[in-house]
Amino acid sequence: IESGDYDVIICNYANTDMVGHTGKIEAAIAAAEAVDECIGRVISALHRAGGECLVTADHGNAEKMVNHASGQPYTAHTTNPVPLIYVGTQKKVFEEGGALCDIAPTLLMMMGLEQPTEMSGKVLLVEPALDEADEDAA
């Protein structure tokens, strides 16, 4: 980020996914803390560079560690909704209820690139958010 050599960086922090399959809550907490630290460093660098990012996940896992019916570790992926978080200098409003296939079109739009017709997803940005001064004037 600090070098400015790249227009886009896409990374996957797999820590909570990998540890979530073990069913060990202490390991999942440590993994989540490590990811939190890493994302914090990325966001700090983005702020210094004037960049923006999306933070999301492709599925849940570590939020459900125990099968409540059996009491055994729950080691599969979940289908729980995951957040889509925008970090940057602009205020943006995103549509709720998007799908994984909507992430790439949204990212392309943020980069000023056209969405290929082969992509079935949609852009999740619905409008620029109003700041407080705009809301007061409305």
Where are the regions a protein language model picked out?
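Feature captures the catalytic ectodomains and active-site-proximal regions of enzymes
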Residues: 1-138
